[in-house]
Regions:
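A general, composition-driven signal for non-globular sequence regions
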Residues: 4-5, 22, 144
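Long, continuous compositionally biased terminal/linker segments
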Residues: 58-61, 66-96, 148-204
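Long, charged/polar, surface-exposed segments that mediate recognition or autoinhibition
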Residues: 89-160
């Protein structure tokens, strides 16, 4: 083997090793994001053992809620209707007699600009559509869209928007967006997203 061939072979090995290392690092970084992995109706302790985010135990015989000890994303693990949210700072998991009965969260770690807000809600809606969720009450509360009409509605502090989705008769999601006065950025339009997940509480 000539010197040039040896140099080229070694260079190829180095490039391959660096590529593999970078891939591993990216996967590790993504998997290091704390998450709460659950499905409505399951034992609370099963969620605790499965989740990478730390969260306290349920209170036997009580209906209450718990909060993760760090920012965390929700991974809803129903085999058909599953979805994943961005990291959340406000995140509560409701339980009744040690069974999970609902989630209420804001899938963001700070108030967002309108463009970023729409990216989050449209991504969630797209996940739901692909998984077979169906928007309900669309005449009164249509799904969010990136249109001039929707942007004007969200900018109106007296309006905002709400969208409801059903997964057959198993689950319901409510998604709410409204303007938020952010004292850290008083000159910017910022928005809060609220997501509620439980068994259906309204009719289609």
């Amino acid at each position: 083997m000539s010197l040039m061939h040896r140099v080229g072979w070694r260079r190829g090995v180095v490039v391959l090793a660096v590529t593999v290392l970078l891939t591993v690092v990216v996967i590790q970084l993504l998997s290091d994001e704390p998450e709460i992995a659950l499905v409505i109706g399951e034992p609370y302790e099963a969620m605790r053992q499965r989740s990478s985010a730390s969260i306290g135990p349920a209170i036997p015989g009580h209906a209450w809620f718990s909060i993760p000890e760090s920012d965390a994303r929700l991974r809803f693990i129903d085999p058909k209707y599953g979805f994943v949210t961005p990291l959340a700072r406000f995140f509560t998991i409701g339980f009744d007699d040690e069974l999970i009965d609902g989630v209420r969260m804001s899938p963001q770690i700070e108030p967002l600009l309108l463009d970023d807000t729409l990216k989050v809600v449209l991504n969630l809606q797209e996940q739901w559509r692909k998984a077979g969720w169906t928007p309900i009450r669309v005449n009164e509360d249509p799904p969010f869209a990136d249109t001039p009409e929707w942007r004007a509605r969200l900018r109106d502090v007296s309006k905002g928007g709400t969208s409801y989705w059903h997964a057959e008769d198993k689950y319901q999601v409510m998604l709410v967006v409204h303007r938020f006065k952010d004292n850290k950025r008083p000159t910017e339009e910022r928005y809060l997203i609220t997501l509620a997940l439980a068994t259906p509480w309204t009719n289609p």
